[in-house]
């Protein structure tokens, strides 16, 4: 019997793959995402799927905005996926494939596809196959990251719809019905996600203002040095 990996094992693997220091402002998010992915991957009912992958990618992109140095982000994402036995390129490729498939669709089309997948009607493509596998799996392990993936697909189709609470709730209620999922937990997770996105946006604005103020301060100091007359030489 294989030994179940611990959170410590996963964290150690992560820091073995990404060896550079992590910006302190973002460290908590990265470690919380890592733990969340770990707990899912060691759950006997969890099965990786492209909607979950999209949730991981979208969450990372959303909450890593403004990270410096920018070039470290790819290494961090790859390390997150590798630490739980995954492949960052696969996550990104399948996430983008889903977004490409929903382009040109309406939200009604997406809901109808979910209903067709549940009833076993013929269909094709990664999105349809994923929806059908979920709808047909009574042991499907729901996760917050799956909810974010579903949310990201709807955003790709109609971002304005998500701004109206009644329409948003009705949309996800219908999607959950098609997938044989309870919508209550999903909608609570999405409300929290939206709130955290807003808070992150506010934090980034504060950081940018502080950086701009510091830049202006340095520029002013340089100008003052440049315009200060040199002392006249002593006779």
From Swiss-Prot:
Pfam families: ThylakoidFormat (PF11264). GO terms for cellular component: plasma membrane-derived thylakoid photosystem II. Keywords: Coiled coil. Residues 179-228 form a coiled coil. It comes from the Bacteria. GO terms for biological process: photosystem II assembly. May be involved in photosynthetic membrane biogenesis. Belongs to the THF1 family. HAMAP family: Thf1. This is Protein Thf1.
């Amino acid at each position: 019997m294989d030994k179940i990996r611990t959170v410590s094992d996963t964290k150690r693997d992560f820091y073995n793959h990404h060896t550079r220091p992590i910006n302190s402002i973002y460290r908590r998010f990265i470690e919380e995402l890592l733990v969340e992915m770990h707990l899912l991957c060691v759950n006997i009912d969890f099965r990786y799927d492209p909607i979950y992958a999209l949730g991981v990618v979208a969450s990372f992109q959303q909450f890593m905005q403004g990270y410096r140095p920018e070039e470290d982000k790819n290494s961090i994402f790859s390390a997150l996926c590798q630490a739980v036995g995954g492949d960052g390129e696969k996550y990104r490729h399948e996430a983008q494939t889903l977004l490409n498939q929903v382009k040109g669709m309406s939200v009604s089309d997406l809901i109808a596809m979910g209903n067709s997948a549940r009833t076993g009607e013929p269909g094709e493509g990664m999105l349809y196959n994923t929806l059908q596998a979920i709808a047909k799996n009574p042991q499907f392990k729901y996760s917050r990251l799956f909810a974010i993936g579903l949310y990201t697909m709807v955003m790709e189709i109609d971002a304005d719809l998500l701004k109206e609470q009644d329409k948003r709730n009705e949309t996800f209620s219908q999607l959950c019905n098609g997938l044989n999922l309870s919508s209550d937990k999903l909608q609570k997770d999405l409300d929290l996600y939206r709130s955290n996105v807003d808070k992150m946006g506010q934090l980034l604005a504060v950081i940018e203002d502080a950086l701009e103020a510091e830049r202006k301060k340095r520029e002013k100091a340089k100008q003052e040095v440049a315009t200060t007359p040199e002392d006249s030489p002593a006779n």
